[in-house]
């Protein structure tokens, strides 16, 4: 699929003059050519010359379109009426190419970093090495460092996503191809077992071609749970303990008296199986399965490592000394064998106790169990104490190098993963809480009509309920199906906390939180399940209540809601029971859908400023949880820049951030790439916490005023299109594949929270995914161009433009907003979007909406150039520029085929091949864009 002299990577589109360093990128281009050629050979061998010729013709014509040599309609005509049997392999070919291009890009990142290091250049920004240099230069006060990093936590939270539809087999095969390309990177022509690398590539690409890329049945939550868990074996078990140890050691070396990071700073989380907001498929059984499978994966890893250590630590008592603690541990092993091998005997004891633990807490037993009749570990701390005894003995007797190896990694892993693996958040919509709590209060005779009460009355009633130990419901109470289900889910969470430890379910998130009573309703449900008790002298609150502010209005009121809750003695007691920590989640997705890109970003920034001030006034330790999606329209973009763009005081050593779908695969599917991405999260967190990165000083308030005005203008322009244009919902539903996202078994969750046609009720993921597939990318830019143009106005002396140019140069937040927007604009394609608009049968509606979109798109690019001084959208992002050049012509056929198949599907041609083709195009585009939803 790629000629040896392929000139198709020449510049195109709105970013065509970007200099991407042709010499620097040539090795990647060679990798892409190699993989593309092997794929082309595979297509020809497996599907014949006719299919190969169609694929190759589509590829060549796509490049000709990009060079403006032919009109796009000629490519569209090629696929008009194409037989579905032929369309499927064409779609698969371009989808596979996108997947292989991802491999080549990932390998090239490693190559560029290696070149950078070999050249002796300073560490790259976003690396921990660069961050340590900045911290050293800042000459920080040790007390400030210690206070800031108290309770530090950086937590990537894995969430389910409808575009991550790849099967485990595909995931594993891609991993093997990556390993082979990595060997080539280091100059090898043969594998470790003497196999020819190119032959192996052909074998694995053939396997990939013959493997179904996607599931044809609707994803079950159990499938999504397994998808999330696979990243632990793939990368997290190796990388997270390693990075935690590296950061802890580096910081303690700089500030040895500060006792920094006594708990691991990097701890993963998950929503999969606990997020029931709008997902009726989450049940008590699902929560139990999610927490149980997570614990299984953790303990299976420990068994594997303990078994390996038993083989490795074979030292004889005749040759080495041991500590009394190790000797006592070994003496608990009564097996007659290995009498002269104290470390092996000690590890057998650990192995046996871990087996007893697994048998008591797991429904499914891992391999490598050992039954010696020894008692279980009651807590991970007990398990760790025995490992520490082995470690201490090794270090005390000249074997530090052994202690630092597998045993050291295992000890770090236990600190992070415990028996729970990752914390599973519970999430539910506030409307559901209100309905259930109203039923419980009525059943218990506390109040017959809770929903009729005013907000102050609700707060008074709920606070009183929280303060008492008495439950509202007795066993066997006759409740509605909804109430039984909700109470059952919280009870399943309580079981997980009891069985796997308090970190198993750390948070209860309230979606669409709009009041103090919304927070207290969740607390009442926690109390019913035994997860909250503030009635005695020792308050118990293992699960934090986390308000999620999602709309722009709620973001603006979030700090006042939080302060009002903290004014209540009952709620303050709950927070104090959690060492004064209060988490607040910020919704990037719904705020963007509500008010548009610029207004949402500014509302989030303002909300953070206000919440930081509220935390200062009330004396709590605030942790912000950023509900970011993969796309810019859902808060995505480079993590390092995004974290540094946070307002002063908003990070303070801690943040959590959602990771979703194909973005998870892009960041965490490989240990080396995972290490780099996790390192980036930590580097940005440390810099944002300990350094002054905002850079505005006394000019902050004038800058904030400018953004207040710009955000209002942007929201006005966005609302005029999305919320006020007659027929807009119809245009959206017919010009994008949003309806098919729900109909074609993508993801376990419905596309809307409620069965309505309202944009407000539509979930943010399908909203953004649909616009991404149709190449409009509207959520990532619309309204911003109008805001800038209107704010600058006539401005005869250019003063206002200079204000914006100065903010771009000095303020990380503003620069990041424009940089992320530029990435979206570079991926948008109004020519392809026009093809999708043709799916709208009402010509007047089509013209009315699409003309507005095109005009705003052009306006936004023009304003970006004025403010940044850059003619090219990707002038400051060479890596993305390379990606755009290398892969976007290969997306063109996928878009044209998607439009063709959507037209057929909607006209009644609903056979299985057409449906599968649409699903495959969605998967292919998501794979190629890498952050589509």
Curated annotation (Swiss-Prot):
One of its GO terms (molecular function) is phosphoenolpyruvate carboxylase activity. It catalyses: oxaloacetate + phosphate = phosphoenolpyruvate + hydrogencarbonate. Forms oxaloacetate, a four-carbon dicarboxylic acid source for the tricarboxylic acid cycle. Its cofactor is Mg(2+). This is Phosphoenolpyruvate carboxylase. Keywords: Carbon dioxide fixation, Lyase, Magnesium. Belongs to the PEPCase type 1 family. InterPro entries: PEP_COase, PEP_COase_bac/pln-type, PEP_COase_Lys_AS, PEPCASE_His_AS, Pyrv/PenolPyrv_kinase-like_dom. The gene is ppc. One of its GO terms (biological process) is carbon fixation. The active site is at 161, 593. Its EC number is 4.1.1.31. The keyword Magnesium applies. Residues 1-23 are annotated as: Disordered. GO terms for cellular component: cytosol. It comes from Mycolicibacterium smegmatis (strain ATCC 700084 / mc(2)155) (Mycobacterium smegmatis).
């Amino acid at each position: 699929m790629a000629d040896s002299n392929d000139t198709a990577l020449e510049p195109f589109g709105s970013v065509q003059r970007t200099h991407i360093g042709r010499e620097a990128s040539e090795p990647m281009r060679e990798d892409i050519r190699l993989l593309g050629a092997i794929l082309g050979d595979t297509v020809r061998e497996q599907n014949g010359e006719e299919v190969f010729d169609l694929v190759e013709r589509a590829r060549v014509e796509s490049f000709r379109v990009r060079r403006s040599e032919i009109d796009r309609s000629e490519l569209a005509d090629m696929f008009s009426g194409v037989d579905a049997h032929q369309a499927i392999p064409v779609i698969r070919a371009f989808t596979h190419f996108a997947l292989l291009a991802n491999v080549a890009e990932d390998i090239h990142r490693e190559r560029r970093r290696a070149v950078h290091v070999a050249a002796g250049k300073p560490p790259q920004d976003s690396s921990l090495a660069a961050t340590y240099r900045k911290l050293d230069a800042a000459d920080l006060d040790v007390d400030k460092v210690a206070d800031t990093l108290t309770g530090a936590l950086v937590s990537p939270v894995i969430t389910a996503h409808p575009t991550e539809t790849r099967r485990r087999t595909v995931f594993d095969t891609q991993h093997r191809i990556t390993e082979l390309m990595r060997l080539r990177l280091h100059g090898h022509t043969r594998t470790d077992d003497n196999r020819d690398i190119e032959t192996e590539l052909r074998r694995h690409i053939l396997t990939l071609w013959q493997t179904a890329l996607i599931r044809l049945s609707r994803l079950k939550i159990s499938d999504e749970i397994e998808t999330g868990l696979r990243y632990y074996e793939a990368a997290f078990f190796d990388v997270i303990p390693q990075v935690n140890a590296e950061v802890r050691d580096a910081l303690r070396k700089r500030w040895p008296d500060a006792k920094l990071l006594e708990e691991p700073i990097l701890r993963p989380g998950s929503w999969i199986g606990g997020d029931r907001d709008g997902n009726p498929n989450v049940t008590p059984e699902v929560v139990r399965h999610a927490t149980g499978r997570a614990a299984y994966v953790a303990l299976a890893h420990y068994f594997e490592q303990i078994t390996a250590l038993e083989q490795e630590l074979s030292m004889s008592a005749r040759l080495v000394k041991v500590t009394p603690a190790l000797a006592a541990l070994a003496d608990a092993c009564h097996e007659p064998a290995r009498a002269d091998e104290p470390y092996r005997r000690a590890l057998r004891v650990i192995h046996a106790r871990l087996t007893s633990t697994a048998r008591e807490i797991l429904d499914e037993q891992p391999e490598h169990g050992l039954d010696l009749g020894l008692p279980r570990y009651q807590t991970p701390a007990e398990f760790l104490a025995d490992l520490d005894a082995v470690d201490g003995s090794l270090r005390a007797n000249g074997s530090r190098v052994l202690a630092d190896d597998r045993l050291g990694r295992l000890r770090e892993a236990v600190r992070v993963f415990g028996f729970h693996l990752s914390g599973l958040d519970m999430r539910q919509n506030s409307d559901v809480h209100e309905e259930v709590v109203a039923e419980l209060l009525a059943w218990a005779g506390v109040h017959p009509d809770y929903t009729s009460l005013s907000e102050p009355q609700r707060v008074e009633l709920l606070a009183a309920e929280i303060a008492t130990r008495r439950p509202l419901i007795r066993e066997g109470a006759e409740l509605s199906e909804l109430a039984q289900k909700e109470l059952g889910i919280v009870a399943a969470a309580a079981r997980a906390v009891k069985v796997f430890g308090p970190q198993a379910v750390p948070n209860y998130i309230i979606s669409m939180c709009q009041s103090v009573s919304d927070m207290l309703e969740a607390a009442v449900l926690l109390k019913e399940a035994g997860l909250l008790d503030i009635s005695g002298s020792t308050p118990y609150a293992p699960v934090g209540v986390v308000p999620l502010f999602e709309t722009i209005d709620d973001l603006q009121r979030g700090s006042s809601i939080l302060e009002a809750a903290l004014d209540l003695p009952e709620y303050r007691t709950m927070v104090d029971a959690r060492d004064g920590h209060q988490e607040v989640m910020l919704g990037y997705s719904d705020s963007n859908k509500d008010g548009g890109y610029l207004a949402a970003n500014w509302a989030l920034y303002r909300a953070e400023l206000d919440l930081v001030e509220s935390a200062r006034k009330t004396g709590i330790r605030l942790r912000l949880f950023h509900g970011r999606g993969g796309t810019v329209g859902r808060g995505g973009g480079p993590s390092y820049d995004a974290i540094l763009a946070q307002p002063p005081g908003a990070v303070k050593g801690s943040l959590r951030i959602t990771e979703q779908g194909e973005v998870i695969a892009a960041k965490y599917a490989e240990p080396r790439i995972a290490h780099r991405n996790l390192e980036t999260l930590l580097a940005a967190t440390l810099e944002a916490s300990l350094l002054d990165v905002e850079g505005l000083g006394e000019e902050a308030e004038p800058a904030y005023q400018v953004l207040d005005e710009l955000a209002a203008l942007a929201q006005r322009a966005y609302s005029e299109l999305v919320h006020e244009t007659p027929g807009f919902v119809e245009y959206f539903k017919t010009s994008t594949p949003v309806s098919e996202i729900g109909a074609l078994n993508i993801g376990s969750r419905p596309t809307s929270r409620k069965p309505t046609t309202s944009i407000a009720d539509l979930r943010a993921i399908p909203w953004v995914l649909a616009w991404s597939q149709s190449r409009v990318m509207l959520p990532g830019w619309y309204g911003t161009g109008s805001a800038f143009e209107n704010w600058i106005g006539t401005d005869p002396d250019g003063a206002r433009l200079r204000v914006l140019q100065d903010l771009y140069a000095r303020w990380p937040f503003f620069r990041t907003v424009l940089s992320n927007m530029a990435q979206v604009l570079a991926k948008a394609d109004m020519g392809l979007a026009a093809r999708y608009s043709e799916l709208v049968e009402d010509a007047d509606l089509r013209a009315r909406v699409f003309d507005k979109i095109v005009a705003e798109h052009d306006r936004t690019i023009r304003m970006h150039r004025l403010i940044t001084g850059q003619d090219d959208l990707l002038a400051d992002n060479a890596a993305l520029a390379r990606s755009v050049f290398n892969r976007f012509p290969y997306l063109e056929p996928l878009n044209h085929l998607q439009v063709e198949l959507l037209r057929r599907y909607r006209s009644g041609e609903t056979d299985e091949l057409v449906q599968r083709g649409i699903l495959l195009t969605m998967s292919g585009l998501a794979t190629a864009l890498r952050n589509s939803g």
